[in-house]
């Protein structure tokens, strides 16, 4: 039983290890500076990262390959973002 609890805690704590995408919402409610958000996507593309534009989802949100530099730029520029798992990204893509 102790082993199972340890494994479950490890999975919950290390969720960011398996996260493979940075989700940048573009809806009015979730993003305060849209121009800076587009700049983040451009920054990622210039760095050679793959991005997906989710035209009909959350105001035209973006999925960018998870990268620490992109995450840091989002923090510096004040861009709203979420780290999501590959499974959640696939669910979003299927919904579109």
Predicted feature residues:
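Sec-dependent N-terminal signal peptides
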Residues: 4-16
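Intrinsic-disorder/low-complexity accessory segments
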Residues: 20-96
């Amino acid at each position: 039983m102790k082993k199972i609890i340890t494994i479950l805690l490890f999975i919950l704590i290390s969720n960011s290890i398996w996260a493979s995408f940075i989700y940048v919402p573009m809806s009015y409610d979730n993003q305060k500076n849209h121009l800076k958000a587009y700049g983040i996507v451009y920054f990622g593309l210039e760095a050679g990262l793959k991005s997906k534009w989710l035209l009909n989802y959350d105001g035209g949100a973006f999925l960018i390959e998870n990268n620490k530099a992109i995450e840091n730029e989002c923090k510096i520029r004040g861009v709203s973002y979420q780290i999501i798992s590959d499974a959640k990204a696939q669910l979003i893509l299927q919904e579109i």
